[in-house]
Amino acid sequence: MPYSRDITKFITATEPEVGLPLLALQHSKSIIGVILLVICLLFILIGIIILAVGGHATAGSIFVVLSLILGGGGFFLIYKDNS
């Protein structure tokens, strides 16, 4: 069969139609991770300001918890991308 494709080319992603989207996805994961870390730092700042003003302890705690979740997700994406 002259037109059959070798399955190992798809596994190793050496063909452009397979390899390029995988490279783009890998690059975008690290960009998303950096964006999540920046949002995390912003939420920490907002949470500290809300907690410092007082009277809104629940809202401040929610921002701090959200920042921890987003920061963990961003760090995980960057870590998995570099390993």
UniProtKB/Swiss-Prot annotation:
Keywords: Late protein, Membrane, Transmembrane, Transmembrane helix, Virion. GO terms for cellular component: membrane; virion membrane. Its main location: virion. The chain crosses the membrane at residues 31-51, 59-79. Induction: Expressed in the late phase of the viral replicative cycle. It is found in: Virion membrane. The keyword Transmembrane applies. The keyword Membrane applies. Belongs to the asfivirus EP84R family. This is Transmembrane protein EP84R. It comes from African swine fever virus (isolate Warthog/Namibia/Wart80/1980).
